[in-house]
Amino acid sequence: MKFKTLGNRNAPAVLFFHAMGVTGESSEPVAQYLQNRYFCILPTSTVYCKGQKYVSKADEVRQVEAYLKSQGVEHLELVVASSIGADLAMAFLTSTELPIGHVFFDGGQFAQIGKGTRRMMTPFLYLAIKSLYWSKGG
């Protein structure tokens, strides 16, 4: 993983988990706004780090925990997670012993949809996408 930080290390900490297809720097505009009051931590998953290999979700969580410890973070005021990052954040939240003040999920995919339901929904999803195409997005 790669970690970027903004703000004062002694300020309350905010941890961001990024969405799929982007890096931790995608949260930088928000972190820049918060950096005067918070220590913002923006990890980038090993999937997006050149020369690193993704091992597992548990390994990603371990790396986040180790980094927080190395920075002296003893409490997280806020954890922010978007899309697939919410899945990693949930794994982090269920295993960490750090106290957490608040959590904000944006578009987390937590639904457990069975194979039968997925098979049944596929034709409808196909038609929905096709109808958007036919209507030219309107």
Predicted regions and their residues:
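Conserved HGGG/HGGXW glycine-rich cap/lid loop of the alpha/beta-hydrolase fold
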Residues: K4-K50
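Active-site signature of alpha/beta-hydrolase-fold catalytic machinery across serine-
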Residues: P29, A91-S95
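A generic structural motif
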Residues: N36-C40, E74, P99
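Active-site loop/oxyanion-hole signature of alpha/beta-hydrolase fold enzymes
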Residues: I41-L78
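Gly/Ala-rich beta-loop-alpha elbow adjacent to hydrolase catalytic centers
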Residues: V80-A89
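Flexible "cap/lid" loop of the alpha/beta hydrolase fold
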Residues: T94, I100-S131
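Helix-loop "lid/cap" segments that line or gate small-molecule binding pockets
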Residues: L132-G138
